[in-house]
């Protein structure tokens, strides 16, 4: 297992494969971990495909556990899209790359959009797989934050630490909140969490909720920001309560250089998803080679 400290946070990551660099933002909501790219952990999104193994045959893949997820650490501060992409930029630099194709799945697509807004020169293309958004996604996030806030008000932060090892992460057990995962992994984080001023902690959690689940638009970028993303983008749509088809349509409408795959999830397979990713990225690789 490889770890790097970026922005003061210990980040569990993997860099493997060969070929053009592919920066990968994992699916899973607040379970955004490397294993969600594997055959076992990612079978919902990738069907029969082991995505990391398959993509590593064509790309130099950079995958990681997002901060406050899996084996990565965290910090108690207002969470935002700006914070979420800082570790990714650091990992890109760690890999010695200045540019990458950027693949984001589920909530990872929101991070891919946020990354493109802040680092457009680092993005060769955007691959947005099952982007999150819509009313039901917003209400899921806000409801989970409400459950955490109610739990902390009733039982305190020590109860979060006690419950975290069984709950594993915020998306599986909302009561433990966004910082339950690092509390379950890192003893020093677990010892510091109960010492937080309760009012300050609750305010930080509320600010995080309002930054990440503020409207029914596709998550990760505002409408105005989406209209300024010039990066060539390929949208692989979802169609359920978290990955609303309307979110993919909104991205296609607002992003000036976006294409929308005309297959819904029930028609998507690991094989045809991989084929579309390779088709889209190879076009830009061949064009870049012709210009060099």
Whereabouts are the PLM-identified features?
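Flexible "cap/lid" loop of the alpha/beta hydrolase fold
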Residues: 110, 117-118, 123-155
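Gly/Ala-rich beta-loop-alpha elbow adjacent to hydrolase catalytic centers
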Residues: 104-108, 112
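Conserved alpha/beta-hydrolase "acid-adjacent" motif
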Residues: 241-247
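Hydrophobic, aromatic-rich cap/lid helix
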Residues: 180-222
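Conserved HGGG/HGGXW glycine-rich cap/lid loop of the alpha/beta-hydrolase fold
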Residues: 6-73
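Short beta-strand/loop motif that positions the catalytic acidic residue
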Residues: 229, 235-237
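Catalytic active-site module of serine/aspartate enzymes centered on a nucleophile-bearing elbow/loop
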Residues: 256-292
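Conserved acidic catalytic loop of the alpha/beta-hydrolase fold
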Residues: 82-100
């Amino acid at each position: 297992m490889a770890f790097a400290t970026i922005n003061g946070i210990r980040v569990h990551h993997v860099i493997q494969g060969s070929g053009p660099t592919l920066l990968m933002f994992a699916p899973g909501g607040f379970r955004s971990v490397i294993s969600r790219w594997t055959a076992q952990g990612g079978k919902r999104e990738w069907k029969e495909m082991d995505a990391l193994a398959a993509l590593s045959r064509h790309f130099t893949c950079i995958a990681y556990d997002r901060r406050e997820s899996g084996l990565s650490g965290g910090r108690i501060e207002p969470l935002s899209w700006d914070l979420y992409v800082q570790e990714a930029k650091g990992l890109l630099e760690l890999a010695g790359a200045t540019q990458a194709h950027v693949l984001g799945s589920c909530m990872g697509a929101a991070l891919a959009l946020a990354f493109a807004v802040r680092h457009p020169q680092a993005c060769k293309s955007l691959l947005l797989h099952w982007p999150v958004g819509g009313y039901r996604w917003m209400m899921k996030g806000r409801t989970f934050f409400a459950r955490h806030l109610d739990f902390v008000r009733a039982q305190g932060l020590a109860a979060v630490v006690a419950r975290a090892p069984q709950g594993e992460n915020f998306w599986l057990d909302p009561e433990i909140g966004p910082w339950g995962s690092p509390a379950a992994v890192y003893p020093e984080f677990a010892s510091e969490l109960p010492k937080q001023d309760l009012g300050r902690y609750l305010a930080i959690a509320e600010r995080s909720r309002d930054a990440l689940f503020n409207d029914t638009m596709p998550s990760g970028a505002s409408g105005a920001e989406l209209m300024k993303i010039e990066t060539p983008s390929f949208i692989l749509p979802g169609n359920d309560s978290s990955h609303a088809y309307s979110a993919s349509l909104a991205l296609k409408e607002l992003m000036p250089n976006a294409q929308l795959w005309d297959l819904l999830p029930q028609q998507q397979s690991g094989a045809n998803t991989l084929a579309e990713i390779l088709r889209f990225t190879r076009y830009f690789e061949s064009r870049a080679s012709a210009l060099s």
